[in-house]
Amino acid sequence: MSERFPNDVDPIETRDWLQAIESVIREEGVERAQYLIDQLLAEARKGGVNVAAGTGISNYINTIPVEEQPEYPGNLELERRIRSAIRWNAIMTVLRASKKDLELGGHMASFQSSATIYDVCFNHFFRARNEQDGGDLVYFQGHISPGVYARAFLEGRLTQEQLDNFRQEVHGNGLSSYPHPKLMPEFWQFPTVSMGLGPIGAIYQAKFLKYLEHRGLKDTSKQTVYAFLGDGEMDEPESKGAITIATREKLDNLVFVINCNLQRLDGPVTGNGKIINELEGIFEGAGWNVIKVMWGSRWDELLRKDTSGKLIQLMNETVDGDYQTFKSKDGAYVREHFFGKYPETAALVADWTDEQIWALNRGGHDPKKIYAAFKKAQETKGKATVILAHTIKGYGMGDAAEGKNIAHQVKKMNMDGVRHIRDRFNVPVSDADIEKLPYITFPEGSEEHTYLHAQRQKLHGYLPSRQPNFTEKLELPSLQDFGALLEEQSKEISTTIAFVRALNVMLKNKSIKDRLVPIIADEARTFGMEGLFRQIGIYSPNGQQYTPQDREQVAYYKEDEKGQILQEGINELGAGCSWLAAATSYSTNNLPMIPFYIYYSMFGFQRIGDLCWAAGDQQARGFLIGGTSGRTTLNGEGLQHEDGHSHIQSLTIPNCISYDPAYAYEVAVIMHDGLERMYGEKQENVYYYITTLNENYHMPAMPEGAEEGIRKGIYKLETIEGSKGKVQLLGSGSILRHVREAAEILAKDYGVGSDVYSVTSFTELARDGQDCERWNMLHPLETPRVPYIAQVMNDAPAVASTDYMKLFAEQVRTYVPADDYRVLGTDGFGRSDSRENLRHHFEVDASYVVVAALGELAKRGEIDKKVVADAIAKFNIDADKVNPRLA
């Protein structure tokens, strides 16, 4: 039942009203009915009735009336002085960096508009990590980082040297431009740029906390996830796209705080409209608790005196472009162009000075109004809350930026502007010192210093603060625990099924089974994982309140409050966010979880690449499984599904470790290696990307001594003898079998011998080669290091064929010890057909490997060129067909 609409206490009266309007419509027409309704609404507005209730848009006033405001628990004057120092230090941080003329950039206006909001939260709401839980998880708006640094400096957590090194990180002891855990691993928890990542990440972080609690893994009941956002940022699809998830999951541990300063980078967010109304309607419709913080305490008297309802009407009518302009002018302008619109509103301020009018504050700059909103959010149960805080961009910055379209880009300021800020916020800096752009500090024992630290101690300590590693020791499975996968498989299976079997091995391991988090974007049946539904259950905070259609089946669709699988529906970005929350739980919760997100490989890095990059920044640890991979392997799905480049995208992320295994035993070794590296003693900040296939074929036993090569990226699979020269053949994934077939043809039909290599990771081999070359360049007097691939291979001509773009295997060209290295790949758009036809079309099958190998030998003069031409004819290769890259 909605709080706004209690049960009808007088149905007879209600019926009378409804019948009356029906009669008017019937007898006098729609226009007359509309007129009467308008008059009723106007009269209701005078009486303070929320005339838009039920439409999702209420009057343009505070949600919490004055009489319901709680008493403010802090010392307002002390907090003002502390806040003024933080404001000042934030601006000094940017100005002092800008003086170095290094073109560093920086943003001042965003924090100035939200400083009071953050200050109230730091003093009264943000709980730090403690012995019971990980504290509140705060997604700070990216552009306000100078303000957070300024507070940490006052707290003694950052030094003046660090502030002076804002955006200067190369030589150490600097501060990152925005929240970046990679760059400040003990400070920032969550990267929130690019914009849009914060809100959707916060939703799934809140969901994951509920998941941990419902599964009995950790008590997260006192934790709140706060996401601080900009109204301009809300245009990002990621910002609003998942808000209904918060309602579905009953995320009352989630609070969005949208700083509605009405401006984005270039100008107004909605100059001709009202962004707060727009957001209110969206969130109200999505089932959130909406709290508007529109006007500060100085408006309370005027609203009490507004017996005509004209002031509220005026507030409702005024568009954002005007509200922005008002705060870039002065009190006289506001008197004329706002209050002067109606005689009733002009009369309200007739005896006010222009200065009094100018001092009318917006809600986002009033600690009392802000505190009331956050306390109400804290008390709300069963639904997420959004706080819409009306603010001014560049608040207090005067002519330099306040309410101006240029505010976001302001990073320099003349001394008149600096003096204005000093005077505006009563900052204790003398005229003699102001040219030095000094920072403000509070001596130990001062009122401000004592209060600042006392408030944080009440809330368990300081934040942001990040825990780089988890403290417990996990008992991980040994490679022998995956023994069944290391042996020859009795039936043909795919590497995807090999992954599922490896997952089942871990689910039987008492030490880590509860830490596994299988994540699916509505494709479990595609990947053969439906057997897990009944085995470990699908997480649902509501349990299962219905009888599933397939209840009589062994693998029925079982939802459970304690379910282990996160089934995110057709929502790759949401599934990715759940994976990221689980993959960073080792830090946020000191509770290492082991997530496996399996998906169509085409819809991974290509679809959610920005999130994958952020995962690297956030130091995620977990497994991404790119199922149905390979341009020609997912054969029937066509152009948009067939992945031939996810490994190109994954290699752009420095701490993403990528593999393209061909055999079940390779999958087992790689997964075991990932467990050891991420969750073993080293606790490496990497995550694994493993592509798996939907093609069934024979899986041999692991050759003796192959383990090291599987981990490092290459090992020799077999040698086939020949009498007329020798080549080296490299393959990965599904195409490795075609490479092996080519080796047989070369030996049988042409007498050419081959060394055949399984390349599990061209990317890791390339990185190893680059590392060796760098070391050798910088250590000219030392014995040169040799790339691993050069240690394994020899100088015979080499041919590589994969189900990915040529660039994938081209990565290692420099490090291959052979002078002749030919790469085959699947450049071009995919299409639907049989695997056989597709592999021939993309020129990666056995016939093309044979022709390429013969061609390399012919270049060396070891065989006649006619042999190559005859092979082309033998395999029915159309030498003049369109290049598949262009086809």
From Swiss-Prot:
InterPro entries: PDC_E1_N, PDH/Transketolase, PDH_E1, PDH_E1_M, THDP-binding, Transketo_C/PFOR_II, Transketolase-like_C_2, Transketolase_N
Cited Gene3D superfamilies: 3.40.50.920, 3.40.50.970
Any one GO biological process: pyruvate catabolic process
Catalytic activity: N(6)-[(R)-lipoyl]-L-lysyl-[protein] + pyruvate + H(+) = N(6)-[(R)-S(8)-acetyldihydrolipoyl]-L-lysyl-[protein] + CO2
S-S pairs: none
Residues the entry annotates as binding Mg(2+): 231, 261, 263
Molecular-function GO term, any one: magnesium ion binding
SUBUNIT field: Homodimer. Part of the PDH complex, consisting of multiple copies of pyruvate dehydrogenase (E1), dihydrolipoamide acetyltransferase (E2) and lipoamide dehydrogenase (E3). In pull-down experiments interacts with CedA.
Name of this chain's protein: Pyruvate dehydrogenase E1 component
